[in-house]
Design a protein with these regions (language model features):
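Short, low-complexity N-terminal intrinsically disordered segments enriched in polar/charged residues
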Residues: 1-21, 119-160, 164, 255-257
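A solvent-exposed, acidic/Ser-Thr-rich amphipathic alpha-helical stretch
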Residues: 21-77, 155-209
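A general structural-boundary detector
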Residues: 35-39, 90, 133, 145, ...
């Protein structure tokens, strides 16, 4: 249940002015509008969207929300925005919730919001997929090698795709941040201890030469079958061509400790 007010700005930058206007003011919408949120699910229609945005305004005020921009990736007619939403939790403590949104004006579902609900609820929540896998979707160069290594459960190949000081941040934020070869090796050895790799089914790939953002469906982790669930990962390349950072946005519960 997190709406980022900057999302319409990304829509504008893609040239979809009418959609951007509809997201800012659904009452004046001149085009169909739809989005998908981890809690609310699919939201379509001006009236439903207007009511949901009003609830969001109240929620942001109550939680004393501050939004930190992380990065934006443009490519293939899409944009992927990343933010950290700093907010007040139920216990009064401040927490940071990583949020990403895929903005895709040509899609029947032009705004797809990705984040874990664990930082808000203390638990994972299964979410139904928003897209179908696309067998044509491919991540390029080192990011493609990283994705293939994750699929195969090859820890050495995964870590080799990262720079020596590369970082991984999980969906729940900086508490799940790992830095450098040693920590990344330990992380992926743990991930692959459930019987093998994590074969992600790609749906979209958005690349700008520096970053690759890919939406996917996860329905297996090692030898454990999972309910099909959506997610998004953004990898940033460093000057050496290796992955400087990988940031994951999903709510998949790993079958490992």
């Amino acid at each position: 249940m997190v709406w980022i007010p900057q999302i319409p700005d990304l829509v504008d930058r893609l040239g979809a002015t009418e959609l951007a206007d509809a997201l800012r003011d659904p009452a004046s919408a001149t085009v169909p509008v739809a989005l998908d949120d981890p809690e609310a699910g699919r939201i379509s229609g001006a009236g439903v969207l207007a009511a949901w945005l009003a609830v969001q305004d109240t929620w942001r005020a109550e939680r004393k929300v501050e939004i930190e921009e992380v990065a934006t990736t443009f490519g293939d007619g899409r944009a992927v925005g990343e933010w950290v939403v700093h907010l007040e939790g139920p216990d009064g403590e401040r927490t940071g919730l990583p949020v990403a949104a895929a903005v895709d004006p040509a899609s029947p579902l032009p705004v797809r919001i990705h984040h874990s609900r664990r930082p808000l609820l203390g638990r994972h929540v299964v979410r139904r997929p928003m897209l179908r896998p696309d067998p044509r979707a491919r991540a390029s160069d080192v990011v493609g090698a990283y994705k293939a290594a994750v699929d195969a459960g090859d820890t050495a190949a995964v870590v080799a795709a990262f720079a020596p000081d590369g970082t991984f941040r999980g969906p729940s934020g900086d508490a799940y941040r790992r830095v450098g070869t040693k920590e990344l090796t330990e992380l992926y050895e743990s991930y692959f201890s459930a019987g093998g790799g994590i074969p992600l089914k790609l749906c979209t790939v958005t690349e700008d030469g520096t970053r690759s953002a890919f939406e996917y469906i996860c329905d297996r982790w090692g030898d454990t079958e999972l309910p099909p669930q959506p997610g998004l990962t953004v990898c940033t390349r460093g000057g050496d061509g290796l992955i400087a950072s990988a940031r994951v946005y999903d709510d998949v519960e790993a079958p490992v400790e």
